[in-house]
Each structure stands twice: as C-alpha cells, then as structure tokens.
C-alpha cells in the first residue's frame, strides 16, 4: 500500500455497474405458427424469448395426407428447442410428435417433451390407433411413422401434474392448468425471464358431465395465445344441446333407422356415452334398441378414465366415492365385431371413429347407410375444412366412395356440436378476465378469426379500453416488444437492515436465469457456493524520460495523480484511485492494479500513454532546455521541476481563486448568463464579531469559494466546494443548476468525471488581516 503525501477525498464509487444486455437478451417475444395460423389443424406454436425456445403442440392436419399433414417443420431447427408442451391428445395437437421426436434433429438437442399424466396415458393409445388406421389406408404415403416410433416418443415424454411448477434451467418455467375440453387437457402458463405467456390450446368454459371447465390462472399473463375455433358463433347452452341431441337420436331410431355418430375415440365420445346411457335409462321404450361404441380403443381407454377420476368434476368424484361408477354403462355396449351390424338390419345407434370419416369404420358405415333415408348421421364435433364430415354438412346428393365411384346420399345430416370449444360469449369473457396486454388468435379459420378480432375490438372500445389482437399466418413471425423492469433482490447481511431512501448499497451483483441478487462478498460462498479471488496484474514498460516527465503526461491525461512510495520504498503514482505506476528503475516503470472492468480500462489507457511518450513532440520540447532533461545517471545537479508540488497549506487564497478550472467555469457561465462574479473568497469573522453579511463559511468557520450569477436583478450563488446553487428566485436557481451540470461535464478532468467528484479544490484557511477586523 502506498503512503499518501496529502489527504485526497475521492467521490463515492458507483455501487453496481450494470452492463448493456447482448442482442439475444433484448426484451422482445417472437411467436411463429408452424400450423394452426389462420387455419384449424396441425397446431404448432413456436415461442422465442431471450434465447429460449418453446414449442406448444405438434399436431397433424386431418384433411391432408402424408407429409402434407405435418406442420411446417423445416422452418425450425428442432435441436435448439428447450421444451415441447403438448396440451392434449387430439390428432391435430399431438399426432406429429412421434415424427418430430424420431425423424428430425430434435433428438440431437437437449429439449424435453411435457404433457399431463392423463394426456400421456391416452396419447400412447391414440397414436397406436393412428398407426393402425394409417395401415388400413390404401395410400401408403400417409404412413409417417410406425409403432416403434410411437413407443419411443411415449417413453421419452415427461408427465406432469396440474398446478405443478416446472422449472427448466435458464429462467424458463411453466405451470399446467385445467383446460376442460378433454380428459388431461391443459393450458400452459409459461414464464421466460419474467415474461408470462398463457397458451390455452383447446379449452372449454362449460362444465359437462365429467370434466371441469377451464380455470383462470392466478397470475396475469403478458400475452395470451388463444383458440378461435368458433369465431363469433354463439352455441346453445348445454341443456338445450342435450335435448336437441337426444331428440334427434330418438327420432332416427323410432322411424326404424340407424344413427351414426362419428366421434374421436377419446373426448366427447365418453361424454355422449354418459348422456345416451342416462337417456336410455329414463326411456324404457328405447331400451330394446342397441347403443354401441365401435372402437376397441374406446374400450381400452375407459380404464384410463377410471384411473384419472380425481381430475374430473365434483359430480363424477362423488359418484365414485359412493362406489357408483358412471362409466359402467348399462345400455351403451362395446361392438366387438362390426359384422354383427350387417346381420341385424334393425334400428341402432353407433358411435364410431374416426371423427372426420376420411377412412376407417365410420367411413365404411357412412357409405353403407347413406342411400337409406331412414338413417341419419349426427356430426357432434367441429369439422375441419377438407374432411368428409365438413362435406356432409353441405348435404350433397352424392358422396365419393373410397372403393371408387359415388354413393347417393339420402340419409339425414345434422350437426350438434359437443366439441368442447368455447363460443364467442365464453371466449370473449375469458379473454377479458385474463386481461393480457396482447391476445394472439390461433386455431381458427381466417374468416372466423377476422370476425372474432373485430368483435373483440368493438367490445373493448365500448368500454373505453384498448387491446392488441394479432392473427398471425403460418410461418409469419409475430414480434412483440415489452418494457420490463429489472428487480434486484438483496440477501444475506445486506438485507439485515432496510436502507433509507437515497442511500447507496454496495455489493456483488449475481445474475442467474435472468434474476438478479445483490449480496455482500462475505456472503457469496454461503448463498451461491462460489468463492472470490483477487487478481493483481503487473505490466512493465521501458522509458527514457525523467520521472517528472511521466507525471506531466499522467497529469495531462487524468487531471489528478497522487504521489507516494510503495511498500518497497519505490516512487509511485496512483491514477484514478486504482492503478499504480511504480518507478522500478531509472529506465523502467511498472503498472500494478487489481483486475476489474474499470481498472483494466484505466491500465490500458495508461499503458498506451506511456508507450507513446518517447515518440511525442511534447517530450522533445520538455527535455530540450538545459536542466530540463531526463536524468538517468547518479550525478547530483539541479533540475527544473516540471510540476510545482503544492499542498493545501502551501496555496494562498489568490492561488486558489485563480485556479484555471474556475476560470473555465466562469467563462462557460458568462456565455449563458452574461454577468458572473467570482471566484470570491472572504476571510472568516473574528471571534465575537457580529455578522457583516459574509455567509461564505462552513460550519467550522473555513471560508467557502463562491461564484455569483446575476440576471435581471436576481442573483444565484454557486458554492464552488459543494457545487450547490442558492437563489431567492427558484426559476433562476433551476436554470443555473442545469447549466452548471453541463459546465462541470465540460471543464472537469478525466479523473474527476470518472470518480464522480467536483472540481479539484483544496480547503484554504486565510488569517484575518486588520482591514477585516
């Protein structure tokens, strides 16, 4: 440590230095739809923020064959995905998962796939069923994966619980919430570096016979990515739908017809089975007419439904508690052999997959029953554009047969949606309750989505509110920018006492996963497991000039240099309170400093300055005159001191008042205000004397230097020690303070600017003379 030759009082060091974040840390969010952008089907949403990448859902388009059914997977480097979140098991949300996990470079990265326990259980069954159905399709190009791919993807997925907070390294976390819709369906509240995104998937805000409705997360998200399946349509309430449905079914079988209901193996099929079983129980006249579900997958899935009763609504849970299993149907039976239908020509009700009737048993039964007007088909779910289910709704005279040719269509076609999607009223209310700053509409046809956006804007405008609604197309990135505050949490000994407002708190700033913690260096190991080390750096430089010349250059660059001796007695300078320049020999100096971002910059600049001394014209001028040269020998002779060493006690009042920094400050103020007086210095009052108007003293009686700015008969006095401004005119005081701030930035030396101090002023005590007595 170098002994100081005089007292130097530096300004307080900055407590925390916060660097600008890199580009990838910019507070913007990018949402790219690889599917379900202004369409229904192949849901796949990519969310990117602060270097993190999340994919929500990976479905197939039911109306497209083969590769064309996949999302636009070539638009993404799947090895960079941090997590995939699957909302539910439906084909248009999960059926592309085996292909992505097994046939892309997703497996080369570190990403994991997450879904709820019930979704994972049913996912394995439905994907195996998808493989089986694809194998039945004569078009082999539709076979995207096999059973081995499905099994491998199923084993790699991670099952999570509702309301479970899942934390992934790097500031990424998510929580699943109930979405209604189907068993196991969830919406995900995703948080990336403090930014919250709610991805709803398909959801329902109406409790049915076995499912709870979608819940509102307790935390308000910044962005809501929301389905828009039904657009502005308003659906009848549940009781009305159930009455219409059961009446339609009863009318078909009472006229001797056969009723076909194409359903997914899981989802509204179980809901309809509960409804029909209850209706048949209440109508004995129908109990001789069989009701079938023609799906082995449906039968196997009932075991899953019984396993996850705890996720269903209170009615189902209470019935199970009474040992009354609602899924033990009395009248709805499993049709193991479809040939039985061809042998028995009487009326019946059959629920069969697949839902969209593109192929499979539901398509076979449609073609077989279509010519008979006594028969009927009831479409109970949402029909995607391009599927046979959507074609039937237009009631064509003929339908295309998979065997070739056309089949006359005489059976009745009705639609009653039990698809467990929200209608406009439910969707609009839910969006308002969530209260997100941005709403992104997905999973809806372009026309429906456009009408929904207009209706939502009108709803908010009527309340005098604004909302940002976006409807991105597939592969068109949507970028949203957010203004986020960075909060620093003090822990350990720093948090022992609450600091007063305006006080400085100094400590180590620890950043992890986009969160910031301030703690004392002594607490670092206890709270983080990290240890600290101090790096002392040294750099030798050869010089050929006198030690005084070195000081002259350092003073010219940094404004103030402290002179002293280091521990071994060698002469040294201290630059800006951080870097030592030690004279290790007459022809060499050594820079020494504790490594830090600020000290490294100072050392770099000092090194560049010292290396340029020999080639500088100023050096030649300084050493050209006799006795003003570098002395590299031991002969004793006089030298002209390039820097007159003056200390506080050596400076007279006249010396201080004529400080060139004050002169530059006065010139700066005169350019703005015109009339400036000073610097002024008056001796203190003698003991016992009365006041004479001289108030330029501190509490110890030492004189203060002042400067007076006069404008329009008003005066503002500047204390040149503290740089405070006082005036009876508040307006003039404010103007002078503003100009003074600019002036100090201009006239201060580099060291004063860096350390945050004022002008270099030493306190001067002036003895009173007789004229002042």
Curated annotation (Swiss-Prot):
This protein's GO CC annotations: mRNA cleavage and polyadenylation specificity factor complex
Entry annotated with the keyword Zinc: yes
Keyword presence, Repeat: no
Residues annotated as the enzyme's active site: 421
Record's compositionally biased regions (Polar residues): 624-637
An example Gene Ontology biological process: mRNA 3'-end processing by stem-loop binding and cleavage
Family: Belongs to the metallo-beta-lactamase superfamily. RNA-metabolizing metallo-beta-lactamase-like family. CPSF2/YSH1 subfamily.
Matching PANTHER family: CLEAVAGE AND POLYADENYLATION SPECIFICITY FACTOR FAMILY MEMBER (PTHR11203), CLEAVAGE AND POLYADENYLATION SPECIFICITY FACTOR SUBUNIT 3 (PTHR11203:SF11)
Name of the protein described by the UniProt record: Endoribonuclease YSH1
Protein source organism: Cryptococcus neoformans var. neoformans serotype D (strain JEC21 / ATCC MYA-565)
Organismal lineage: Eukaryota, Fungi, Dikarya, Basidiomycota, Agaricomycotina
